[in-house]
Amino acid sequence: MPRYYPVFIDVTERTCVVIGGGAIGQEKVEKLLESDAEVLVISPVVNQKVRDMADAGQVTWEQREYKPGDLAGAFIAIAATDDNKVNRQIAAEAQERNVLLNVVDVTHLCTFIAPSVARRGEVTIATSTGGASPALARTFREKLTGSRILEYADLAPVLASARAELREASLVVKPDHWQTQITEELLDMVQAGQTDEARKMLMDGLMEGASPVAAS
């Protein structure tokens, strides 16, 4: 089994091809749209939700079977078909064109796999089992989604603001000291709407460990 390199990919305004228009294809399309991709769906038949997205101009739908050449100009491609022959053809073209490819539930044909994702605010936590057990990855996601730990995502705006202020002042704080300031008390204050007080407490704590950026 490959040892996958974990990475987040910016697909904004990039052409992403989804081959297949059933429930799984629909799920892939929706996730790509959430990331502002330009989505092309190729399938002779699509479900109503995909059809509605096409009618609304959210995606481009070509109502036909896949044919070689369909991945020209694609940034990534997703094969959501149950046709092994077609999947192999898509994989061959993707390899030839250096297009990143996910073939749903056919790990050995993939050059990337889609993790199970838990999101809150600006924080995204992706979990993968390398294709060994998607059910286990979903279990991680569900447990994270219902846990206190994911609520720490609510701190992201305050932490980003503090980071920007330190950068503006040409100050640096070591990672270990940063982590000591990310506390339950800080989270409670932010969730109670005491954002200004939380930010002040955070900055006071960070300044205790801040030092000037070394001259280059």
Where are each of the predicted segments found?
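E1/E1-like adenylate-forming module used to activate ubiquitin-like modifiers
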Residues: V103-A153
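An accessory alpha-helical subdomain
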Residues: G131-S216
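Glycine-rich, highly charged phosphate/nucleotide-binding loops
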Residues: D52-A72
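Residue-level detector of alpha-helix initiation sites
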Residues: A23-I24, N84-K85, G131
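ADP-ribose/adenylate-binding Rossmann-like module
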Residues: I76-D82, N87-A114
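Short loop/edge segments at beta-strand edges and connector loops
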Residues: S43, W61-E65, D105
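Hydrophobic, well-ordered beta-alpha structural blocks that scaffold small-molecule cofactor pockets
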Residues: M1-V45, V50-M53
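Hydrophobic beta-strand scaffold residues
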Residues: V39, W61, L100-L101
